[in-house]
């Protein structure tokens, strides 16, 4: 089953700001993950996030694109079979997680 993918407007901007090869990698990863975006402990592809370095991302998941050094942070909305993309960005010094925390607060997620 494919879940619906929805992006925060800021995440759409993140995707557009990537270079062409990075964008292709991210879209391929999202296409794969949307088949089963649940956490790995439920048999899905998402790695659960928690409360670390002042960023409480409990209930959110990530997908790592190691070769590109990118992360995709998202939330699963089970009642709507939806995968909500919060941020797409470089792993650099946990910065992507700080951005995710800010967007979660701004959007009351």
Describe the function of each predicted region:
Residues 5, 42-43, 98:
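Non-catalytic, surface-exposed connector residues within folded enzymatic/regulatory domains
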Residues 1-31:
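Arg/Lys-rich, positively charged N-terminal/basic patches that mediate binding to nucleic acids
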Residues 2, 27, 57, 80-82:
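A structure-centric signal for secondary-structure junctions around beta-strands
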Residues 1, 59, 70-72:
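Residue-level marker for the onset of beta-strands and adjacent loop->beta junctions
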Residues 35-64:
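A short, surface-exposed loop/turn module that caps and links secondary-structure elements
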């Amino acid at each position: 089953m494919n879940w619906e993918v929805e992006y925060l407007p800021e995440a759409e901007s993140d995707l557009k700001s990537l270079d062409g090869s990075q964008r292709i990698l991210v879209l391929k990863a999202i296409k794969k993950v949307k088949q089963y975006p649940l956490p790995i402990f439920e048999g899905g592809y998402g790695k659960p996030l928690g409360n670390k370095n002042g960023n409480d991302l409990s209930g959110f998941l990530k997908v790592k694109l190691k070769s590109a050094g990118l992360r995709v942070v998202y939330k699963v909305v089970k009642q709507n079979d939806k995968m909500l993309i919060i941020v797409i960005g470089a792993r650099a010094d946990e910065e992507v997680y700080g951005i995710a925390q800010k967007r979660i607060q701004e959007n009351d997620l």
